[in-house]
């Protein structure tokens, strides 16, 4: 709590006093030195030099020669004021001014001090009689005879004291330290040397003769009110003294004065004496850890002066000099010895280690209740609510405000009911005034009656001061009467308010008046001759007069013991209030030994970043002082905090031993929940407090060790790593015990910390991953919600499942975290008792365990079991960090019984963590756990993926491991050693937007030789583009390599924020790898820390672990399932004119996958690389990329659901194109139409059969000799036919191939203009076209159709040139040719671009010989079709040149896979420019982003049953790839289809987005009218269903065009929580609501389908099928397909017709499928179906539909397109409405109510509503209700 605020007058007087004081000091300095006020600077240097200015001797003083003097050894002879030569002479000291005023100008020489007159040995040590030298006095009343007594108390503890043998002087009446009776210890670690003239004492470590304490550096001064002694120290590394704000844990030795005298003074950046009186310090001597400590048992005011030598000078104004010296082999031992002397810390109550909330001045109990409520709601672990003085009536102890805090006892009971505690503040000052009601203040009256107050100097009159209640008296807690009174008052009040602990404040002791309300007497106690450098330089400032009297003595002597004595008295009170319970005492003022009785907080700090940092030093110092239960006010007490500061402070404060958030009156609340339930601060606080509560068993065990052995809890790094001098100065991080390293962020805006990592194995606490750092400073990335937590290898940590209170958490299962050391060992221990009973250790009522790991064995040994209640708890989980090999078996045993297998374990290879669960090891017994490790076969990564067969010789020559003893025949026999790590990380830079790391090839590690030459220097760049998207890229920073010229939609600068990112990225160093972790689960979702990483010029390889076996994507290739098979299958990717087949690389190139995570999340990964590659899937699970060029450029999308991850990917590559409405109609095509008449015959047959049919195609046979932009003589009537059908509402699409003939004998404008515009691909550095042969035939020859393809190529194919679509000029040329053909030859509505892999019928060029072997036959050839035939097989030569839009050139080797992509946009742009309409482009070859402009069909499939299910897989994959308008050739392209197959395929194809029946020449016709009437009727029926649903389908296509995502949707995208759906691929969804379950096997009328967990309706009947969450046999007729509508959705529909042109004029209808709650919703997107960019230009109608029980409404979201004839609502079908009889249905439309015609089928819960009698259009809102 803060002090009272000063009045304006007081502030004015203080300011004036300070000004006068400063002027006086300046004048004294100038007069004393007679030197200029401005220091002269040597003109040759800007740095002032330090030199002596005068030399003076006074009287008979013999000053040291200037030449030999060490100025840093000067001991100040005038410490009380600025020195003058006159005073110096008067004191007979040496006067030698210096131009640095920090250095004493007047200093002692050897003429001062004492001589030894006699020395004797005693039973405890020795005694020496000292006589004072005849020298002038400093402050009068010198004591001439002094007695030195030494006591060798233990082998490592020496006491020596200097007393007045003739007069009893005040000595500290310590309540634990007792007099030593002897005998003297033998075999001590120290020697004591006493020098006789002048007297000095040295303490020497025997083992190395190091002098630890040496008072010969200065004289002993011993007078009545001034005692001085100095000692030279052997080390510059000293720690301790208090209480002050020490900005650094290690003391600054540069002439620092630290006063010690308890004072109510808030913390600040100065040397003010604060609340406590701590006179212990410690020094570390050397890297062996040897250390010593010094304690002065003295409670009088003093100051400690530290100077650089180093020298410590004590200036004490009373008592005696009573020193204890402690020698230890380590710093920790020294602290233990000190605490053994003063009393080890109390064992805290377990609940007091929980988080506490407090505030000075909540103002009312209602506010406190709200604070408690909101933090409970935020699930903040929170044990204790604390009340400051505002709960009291008029600030009076033992009262509460019955107005503002009315109901306080009930509130406390509510806390208890929730397992929480209540702590109240008590100040020592007791009001002398009556209660607010006028009643007597009984606590005061009872105290008066028992004479318990501190008295004035007369010893009988209570001294009266002023504190919070006004005029007050002060209990004398040193008096037995007072202790009894205090205990009684606490007990009485506890009966009124059932508090659980006490916070004692203001006990320095503090008063708001100087001394008393009478002032203070003018005497040497109130005004001593020397006043240390205390605040205000006034002894009784803010406290009592120094001549006031207590039971232990004068206030002058015992002032600094007030808080100590109050803590002891409060402990007695607690014993009475809580018999046999520990309770909790928190004190502000402390003395040596206070930790036996109370905890401590660091006082009234300020909400600044500096004070948060300084709190660590304060905490560590109080650990030295024996008060381990310590912490600072989290978020700051004074001043307004900020969210960032408070968040960071909450992170740090979660690891204070005493963790309390507390602030002052007048400032905003700062409890965590105040910042908002979903704030980053709340999330971070909850997270780290949960970790604190998880670790409480470990923390509690540390407190047990502090209580039993004096060990530190919050531990300086140097205590554990003393052999490393870097640790001696580390104070921005600290340890819990020996094992948990805590690294907070202490700087505003920082997200990285320069952290020193000591020499040990360290594991990230949150992930369990081993860190590569050791004995080095690192830039640790600590984003906004993170603090550094690292577990030290070699230690075992007990944990417990957390809860929101310790009451609850103590009942939860226990566990262990084992952090293995380098030698795979670890040790630990665990203490457990009931958490609250007093003296359980002393009474043996506890459980104690030791843990030890070695050789994969964990021994859990109970060494003490006398707490039977604790045996109900059990160790349930054991997490072992650093398990380097896969664990194959875990066995367990109890009490030396035989081992049994335990199957419940998982091994995380990314983090090398073994997690063993469900153990049920009850406390009180011994257990053993063993785990077996092996390098699993499934972990092997092939080292010889080459085209030739691996042999042992080739394998070993490469540097890899050969092993033919494989269990799985697919496992590689040649594989990488686990230690393979060719690149080392030379530097890593973290920034708020990403990471940059440099890699260097390490020749000593590069023993494996892979294809091509390795690149020496690499750079890794990580960019946090979005909260859900991260890019990571590896490239050569010194030589520009090819990068994919495909633009992505990514932010120009990263937009992610640290607090909202879904991921964390880390560069691992040994081995190098990139790890990406999902924050929400901690799951590693990318982990390339696997062997085999290579970055060679033409061979790049990287592997990553996968988070599960569920991975989807990569293409284009024919897959047998949607989920990839991870059994060492390799799939090549390189665009090729290759009909689909197993493991055959086909038309497209999509290096994208989506992976599912076991925890129920999904993510996607794109490798932006267009070079040939292959990917191997391994059962690890893992995958390996092998790429033969470019760079590694990955993009990850974090989802977290499959659909969201897909949308995120599409946002980057571009949302799918919006097709025209007509393109959703049924389409017919055939390669092999002989003439126009055949097409006309087909068309007329379809029309006559009334089969829905929108689009007719022609393949290349319409062209003259397969030349683009020509029409063959056999098709001369085709333009007229196209005009005819277009006039009837149909559409026409033509095919265009890229290859342009160059052998024409007559002008061929397409080639001629192309050559003129230089559009064709050429050989590099020449103007020569690289000729190919494709479809175009030579002119003037007769085609022999009996020839094979290869024979025909030689006989009749023309030389053809490939347009270079990367060139700007090519797009212009292509547009002109398309426009010219449209205007001058034939109209069309869409374009089908084929053969654009690009495909050639020769290898590379017409000679089949290319010019660059290295490119066409690269050192590594991916696993592609025709693997040994070269990359140029059936395509262009790899060395041919393309020109990008920026004019730069690239090789076909790099951009081959982009050829189809490069053609797509120019074609789409040309189509729209030509037709002025949206149109559709269908492309065979695709690359990421192509879906923005084109659809895709799945290529030249086969008329086989197995090609049907593969078409579903292909559609779902292309949905992932961002190409939603997809489908397969219905009934198959190759081979003769057959009736049953074509029937089922037509039923399936009716629900392809792109529904086209297409086959090849010389096979039978397979169009619907080519079969029989039954087939015709089946086709008509199923296509009528399609056309009915087109508004719904069109709306879904709009949704993914606007937002990304899937139209053909895998079931798992909607039912991700149902893992059964993760394997389903024989069914699919249209959007979220329409499920298709086709028949994919011959001659069956039963299909086995999965019905996800939702309400489903049979589309054909409208009935609820009553099945969910199970596999079901679905029966159907030959002419039908299973279709189901999902409850909760509304599907807009339209009456079907033969074309979409006609259907769009029919009535709309709605299918309303209610969910279990009779709710549903849906939407309609509607435009004219053909205009370009209607969504982007707001030219559309958008309607939202909602069903709420018995009311259906529509809401208009956009009205940019209205055509009332297209949007007439005619029918509504409501399914699943319940079987309540409906009597009426009403329509509210245009504010008029209409009764409607309806039909209800009660049993089937169907309501059919007819609106055709009313002109209802959807451009106005509707409301339909029934009752």
From Swiss-Prot:
InterPro entries: Gal_mutarotase_sf_dom, Glyco_hydro_31_AS, Glyco_hydro_31_C, Glyco_hydro_31_CS, Glyco_hydro_31_N_dom, Glyco_hydro_31_TIM, Glyco_hydro_b, Glycoside_hydrolase_SF. Residues 2-12 are cytoplasmic. It holds the Pfam family Glyco_hydro_31_2nd. The keyword 4Fe-4S does not apply. One of its GO terms (molecular function) is carbohydrate binding. The chain crosses the membrane at residues 13-32. It is a single-pass type II membrane protein. Residues 43-64 have a biased composition (Low complexity). CDD domains: GH31_MGAM_SI_GAA, GH31_N, Trefoil. Residues 39-64 are annotated as: Disordered. The modification Sulfotyrosine is found at residues 391, 400, 1382, 1385. Residues 1008-1827 are annotated as: Sucrase. It catalyses: Hydrolysis of sucrose and maltose by an alpha-D-glucosidase-type action; Hydrolysis of (1->6)-alpha-D-glucosidic linkages in some oligosaccharides produced from starch and glycogen by alpha-amylase, and in isomaltose. SMART domains: PD (SM00018). Substrate binds at residues 264, 388, 588, 662. The resulting sucrase and isomaltase subunits stay associated with one another in a complex by non-covalent linkages. This is Sucrase-isomaltase, intestinal. It comes from Oryctolagus cuniculus (Rabbit).
């Amino acid at each position: 709590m803060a002090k009272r605020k000063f009045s304006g007058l007081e502030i004015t007087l203080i300011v004036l006093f300070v000004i006068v004081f400063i002027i006086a000091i300046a004048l004294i300095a100038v007069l004393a030195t007679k030197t200029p006020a401005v220091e002269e600077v040597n003109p040759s240097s800007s740095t002032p030099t330090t030199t002596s200015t005068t030399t003076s001797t006074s009287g008979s003083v013999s000053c040291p020669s200037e030449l030999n003097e060490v100025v840093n050894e000067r001991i100040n002879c005038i410490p009380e004021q600025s020195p003058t030569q006159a005073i110096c002479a008067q004191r007979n000291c040496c006067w030698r001014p210096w131009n640095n005023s920090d250095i004493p100008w007047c200093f002692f020489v050897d003429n001062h001090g004492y001589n030894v007159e006699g020395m004797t040995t005693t039973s405890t040590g020795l005694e020496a009689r000292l006589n004072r030298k005849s020298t002038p006095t400093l402050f009068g009343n010198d004591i001439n005879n002094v007695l030195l007594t030494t006591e060798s108390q233990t082998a490592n503890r020496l006491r020596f004291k200097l007393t007045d043998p003739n007069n009893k002087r005040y000595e500290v009446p310590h309540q634990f330290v007792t007099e030593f009776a002897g005998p003297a210890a033998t075999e001590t670690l120290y020697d004591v040397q006493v020098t006789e003239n002048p007297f000095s004492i040295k303490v020497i470590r025997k083992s190395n003769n190091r002098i630890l304490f040496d008072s010969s550096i200065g004289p002993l001064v011993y007078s009545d009110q001034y005692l001085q002694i100095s000692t030279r120290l052997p080390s510059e590394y000293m720690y301790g003294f208090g209480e002050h704000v020490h900005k650094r844990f290690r003391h600054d030795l540069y002439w620092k004065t630290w006063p010690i005298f308890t004072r109510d003074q808030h913390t600040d950046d100065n040397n003010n004496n604060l609340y406590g009186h701590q006179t212990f310090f410690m020094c570390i001597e050397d890297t062996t850890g040897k250390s010593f400590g010094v304690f002065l048992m003295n409670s009088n005011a003093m100051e400690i002066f530290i100077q650089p030598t180093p020298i410590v000078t004590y200036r004490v104004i009373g008592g005696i000099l009573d020193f204890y010296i402690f020698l230890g082999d380590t710093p920790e031992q020294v602290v233990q010895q000190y605490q053994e002397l003063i009393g080890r810390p109390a064992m805290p109550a377990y609940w007091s280690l929980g988080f506490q909330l407090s505030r000075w001045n909540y103002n009312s109990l209602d506010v406190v209740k709200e604070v408690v409520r909101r933090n409970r709601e935020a699930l903040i672990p929170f044990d204790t609510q604390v009340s400051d003085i505002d709960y009291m009536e008029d600030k009076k102890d033992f009262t509460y405000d019955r107005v503002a805090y009315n109901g306080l006892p009930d509130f406390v009971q509510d806390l208890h009911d929730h397992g929480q505690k209540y702590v109240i503040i008590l100040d020592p000052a007791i009001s002398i005034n009556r209660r607010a009601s006028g009643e007597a203040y009984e606590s005061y009256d009872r105290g008066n009656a028992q004479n318990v107050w501190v008295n004035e100097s007369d010893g009988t009159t209570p001294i009266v001061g002023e504190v919070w209640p006004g005029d007050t008296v002060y209990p004398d807690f040193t008096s037995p009467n007072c202790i009894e009174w205090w205990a009684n008052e606490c007990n009485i009040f506890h009966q009124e308010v059932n508090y659980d602990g006490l916070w004692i404040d203001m006990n320095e002791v503090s008063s708001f008046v100087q001394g008393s309300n009478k002032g203070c007497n003018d005497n040497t106690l109130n005004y001593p001759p020397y006043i240390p450098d205390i605040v205000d330089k006034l002894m009784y400032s803010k406290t009592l007069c120094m001549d006031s009297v207590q039971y232990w003595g004068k206030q002058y002597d015992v002032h600094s013991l007030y808080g100590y004595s109050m803590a002891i008295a409060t402990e007695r009170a607690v014993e009475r209030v809580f018999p046999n319970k520990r309770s909790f005492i928190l004190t502000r003022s402390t003395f040596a030994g206070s930790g036996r009785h109370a905890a401590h907080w660091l006082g009234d700090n300020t909400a600044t970043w500096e004070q948060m940092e300084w709190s660590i030093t304060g905490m560590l110092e109080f650990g030295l002082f024996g008060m381990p239960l310590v912490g600072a006010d989290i978020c700051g007490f004074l001043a307004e905090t900020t969210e960032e500061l408070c968040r960071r402070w909450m992170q740090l404060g979660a690891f204070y031993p005493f963790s309390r958030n507390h602030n002052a009156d007048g400032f905003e609340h700062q409890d965590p929940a105040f910042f908002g339930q979903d704030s980053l601060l709340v999330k971070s606080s909850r997270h780290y407090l949960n970790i604190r509560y998880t670790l409480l068993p470990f923390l509690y065990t540390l407190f047990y060790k502090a209580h039993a052995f004096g060990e530190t809890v919050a531990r300086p790094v140097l205590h554990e790593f003393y052999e490393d001098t870097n640790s001696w100065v580390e104070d921005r991080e600290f340890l819990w015990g020996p094992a948990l390293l805590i690294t907070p962020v202490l700087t505003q805006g920082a997200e990285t910390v320069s952290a020193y990592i000591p020499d040990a194995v360290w594991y990230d606490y949150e992930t369990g991953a081993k860190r590569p750092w050791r004995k080095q400073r690192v830039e640790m990335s600590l984003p906004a919600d993170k603090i550094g937590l690292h577990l030290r290898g070699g230690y075992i940590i007990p944990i417990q499942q957390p809860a929101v209170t310790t009451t609850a958490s103590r009942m939860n299962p226990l566990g262990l975290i084992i952090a293995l050391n380098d030698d795979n060992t670890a040790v630990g221990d665990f203490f457990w008792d009931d958490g609250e009973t007093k003296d359980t250790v002393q009474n043996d009522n506890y459980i104690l365990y030791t843990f030890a790991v070695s050789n994969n064995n964990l021994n859990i040994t109970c060494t003490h079991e006398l707490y039977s209640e604790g045996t109900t708890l059990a160790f349930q989980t054991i997490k072992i960090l650093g398990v380097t090999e896969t664990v194959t078996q875990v066995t367990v045993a109890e009490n030396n019984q035989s081992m049994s297998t335990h199957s419940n374990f998982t091994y995380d290879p990314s983090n090398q963590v073994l997690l063993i669960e469900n153990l049920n090891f009850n406390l009180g017994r011994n257990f053993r756990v063993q785990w077996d490790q092996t390098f699993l076969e499934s972990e092997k990564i092939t080292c010889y993926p080459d085209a030739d067969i691996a042999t042992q010789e080739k394998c070993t020559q490469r540097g890899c491991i050969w092993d033919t003893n494989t269990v799985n025949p697919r496992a590689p026999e040649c594989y990488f050693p686990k230690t393979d790590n060719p690149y080392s990380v030379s530097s890593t830079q973290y920034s708020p937007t990403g990471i940059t790391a440099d890699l260097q090839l390490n020749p000593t590690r590069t023993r494996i030789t892979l294809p091509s030459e390795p690149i020496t220097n690499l750079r890794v760049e990580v960019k946090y583009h979005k909260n859900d998207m991260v890019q990571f890229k590896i490239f050569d920073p010194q030589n520009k390599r090819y990068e994919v010229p495909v633009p992505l939609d990514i932010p120009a600068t990263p937009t992610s924020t640290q607090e909202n990112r879904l991921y964390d990225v880390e560069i691992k160093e040994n081995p190098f790898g990139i790890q990406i972790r999902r924050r929400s689960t901690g799951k590693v979702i990318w982990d390339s820390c696997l062997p085999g990483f290579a970055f060679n010029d033409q061979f790049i390889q990287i592997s990553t672990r996968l988070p599960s076996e569920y991975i989807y994507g990569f293409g284009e290739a024919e897959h047998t399932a949607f989920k990839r098979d991870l059994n060492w299958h390799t799939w090549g990717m390189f665009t090729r004119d290759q009909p689909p087949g197993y493991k055959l690389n086909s038309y497209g190139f999509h290096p994208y996958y989506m992976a599912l995570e076991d925890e129920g999340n999904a993510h996607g990964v794109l490798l932006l690389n267009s070079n040939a590659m292959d990917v191997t899937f391994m059962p690890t699970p893992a995958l390996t990329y092998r790429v033969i060029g470019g760079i590694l450029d990955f993009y990850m999308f974090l989802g977290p659901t499959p659909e969201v991850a897909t949308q995120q990917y599409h946002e980057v590559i571009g949302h799918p194109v919006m097709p025209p409405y007509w393109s959703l109609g049924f389409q017919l095509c055939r390669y092999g139409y002989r003439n126009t008449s055949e097409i006309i015959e087909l068309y007329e047959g379809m029309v006559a059969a009334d089969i829905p049919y929108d689009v007719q195609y022609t393949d290349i046979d319409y062209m003259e000799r397969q030349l683009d932009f020509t029409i063959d003589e056999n098709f001369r009537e085709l333009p007229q036919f196209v005009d005819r059908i277009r006039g009837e509402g149909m559409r026409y699409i033509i095919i265009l191939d890229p290859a342009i003939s160059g052998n024409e004998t007559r002008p061929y404008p397409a080639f001629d203009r192309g050559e003129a515009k230089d559009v064709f691909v050429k050989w590099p550095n020449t103007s020569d076209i690289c000729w190919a042969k494709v479809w175009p035939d030579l002119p003037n020859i007769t085609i022999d159709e009996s020839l094979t393809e290869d024979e025909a190529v030689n006989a009749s194919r023309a030389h053809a040139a490939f347009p270079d679509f990367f060139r700007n000029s090519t797009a212009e040329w292509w547009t002109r040719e398309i426009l010219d053909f449209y205007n001058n030859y034939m109209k069309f509505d869409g374009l089908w671009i084929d053969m654009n892999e690009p495909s050639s019928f020769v290898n590379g060029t017409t000679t089949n010989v290319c010019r660059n072997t290295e490119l066409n036959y690269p050192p590594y050839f991916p696993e592609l079709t025709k693997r040994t035939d070269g990359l140029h097989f059936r395509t262009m030569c790899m060395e041919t040149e393309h020109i990008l839009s920026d004019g730069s050139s690239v090789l076909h080797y790099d951009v081959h896979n982009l050829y189809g992509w490069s053609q797509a946009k120019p074609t789409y742009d040309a189509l729209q420019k030509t037709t002025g309409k949206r149109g559709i482009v269908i492309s065979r070859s695709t690359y990421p982003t192509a879906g923005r402009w084109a659809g895709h069909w799945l290529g030249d499939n086969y008329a086989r049953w197995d090609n049907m299910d593969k078409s579903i897989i292909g559609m779902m994959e292309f949905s992932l790839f961002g190409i939603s308008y997809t489908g397969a050739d219905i009934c198959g392209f190759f081979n003769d289809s057959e009736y049953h197959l074509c029937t089922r395929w037509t039923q399936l194809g009716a629900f392809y987005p792109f529904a086209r029946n297409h086959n090849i020449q010389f096979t039978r016709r397979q169009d619907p009218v080519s079969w029989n009437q039954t087939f015709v009727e089946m086709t008509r029926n199923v296509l009528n269903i399609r056309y009915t649903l087109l508004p719904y389908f069109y709306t879904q296509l709009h949704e993914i065009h606007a937002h990304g995502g899937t139209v053909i949707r895998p079931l798992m995208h909607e039912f991700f929580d149902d893992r059964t759906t993760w394997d389903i691929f024989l069914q699919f969804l249209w959007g979220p609501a329409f499920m298709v379950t086709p028949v994919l096997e011959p001659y069956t009328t039963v299909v086995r389908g999965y019905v996800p967990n939702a309400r489903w309706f049979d589309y054909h009947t409208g009935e609820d099928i009553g099945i969910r969450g199970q596999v079901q046999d679905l029966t159907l007729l030959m002419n039908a397909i299973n279709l189901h509508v999902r409850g909760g959705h509304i599907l807009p529909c339209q009456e079907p017709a033969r074309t979409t042109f006609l259907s769009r004029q029919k009535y709309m209808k709605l299918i309303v499928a209610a969910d279990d709650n009779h709710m549903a919703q849906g939407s309609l997107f509607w435009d004219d179906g053909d205009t370009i960019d209607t969504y982007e230009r707001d030219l559309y109608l958008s309607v939202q539909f909602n069903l709420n029980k018995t009311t259906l409404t529509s809401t208009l979201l956009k009205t940019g397109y209205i055509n009332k004839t297209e949007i007439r609502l005619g029918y509504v079908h409501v399914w699943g409405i319940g079987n309540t009889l409906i009597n009426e249905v009403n329509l509210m439309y245009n504010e008029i109510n209409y009764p409607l015609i309806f039909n209800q089928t009660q049993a089937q819960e169907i309501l059919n509503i007819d609106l055709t009698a009313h002109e209802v259009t959807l451009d106005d809102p509707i409301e339909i209700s029934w009752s």
